[in-house]
Amino acid sequence: MANEGEEIELTEFPETEKERKDEEKLSSCSEETTDTSSSSSSDHVPAPIEVNVIIQNSSRTEDELQNSTKFAVANEGKEIELTGFQGKLSSCSEETTATSSSYSSKQASVCIEENGDNETSTYRPQNVLTNLNSLYTTFEDARAQGKGMVRYKSEDLQSFLEKYPPDYRKPKRDLSATWDPGMPTPALPPRPANLGERQASTVRLHVKESNCKQPRERKANERNIVKDLKRLENKVNAIICLVVVILAVLLLVTVLSILHIGMKS
């Protein structure tokens, strides 16, 4: 009955005084829990981890602290329960520090294992840029390898043009310097057979022109010869005609002279 009377009297207080008292007791309880947790976890975990753990425990147990303070206000004479609750909080803080230390050690071991795997592994994502840069080669390397990508640089282009002129695909080599005098001269390839009209129709234009060059020249020569022969024939005919005319004139002259002599006699 006395407890019920005390609870009724407490409910009659204004809300502002209740909140003020609750805040004071919450601050005192949080200070005590921080002291106990720091003393218990100083042997296992360094200082920065203690602060994090204490903040987590205080954030998790705010509702429990409020309930305990209400119970303590209702029973002002009974402070043993608060000490028991603080003991529970200290044990919980020790467990959390132990778990956090074990988790940190596991994480460190995992990091070490990952580093070891990266050292022994063939695939390294951090070296992607270097691998890509190795694909780009100069003009000379790309020409020697026959593959790979070529990065454009004005210096490389200038050196390429200086080293390889436009007619570098048709090099002029003097084989006499490296030719052994005891070696026989290489034989010429066999002469290709003459192509007929049907076969020549399937050959390219430049091949046809090279093959038909001599017949054209021969035909032109034949035409010139025919023209010359015609001219000679005309000249011979003219000379023969003149000779015949001269002979006819001589015959007439002789005949007329004979007749004239016969008439006089």
Swiss-Prot record:
It is found in: Host cell membrane. Residues 155-164 are annotated as: CSKH/LBD2. Residues 260-265 are extracellular. GO terms for cellular component: host cell plasma membrane; membrane. The modification Phosphotyrosine is found at Y123, Y136. The keyword Zinc-finger does not apply. Residues 15-26 have a biased composition (Basic and acidic residues). Its main location: host cell. Residues 225-234 are annotated as: SH3 binding. The SH3B/LBD1 (SH3-binding) region binds LCK SH3 domain and CSKH (C-terminal Src-related kinase homology) region binds the kinase domains of LCK. Both motif are required to activate LCK. This is Tyrosine protein kinase-interacting protein. It comes from Saimiriine herpesvirus 2 (strain 484) (SaHV-2).
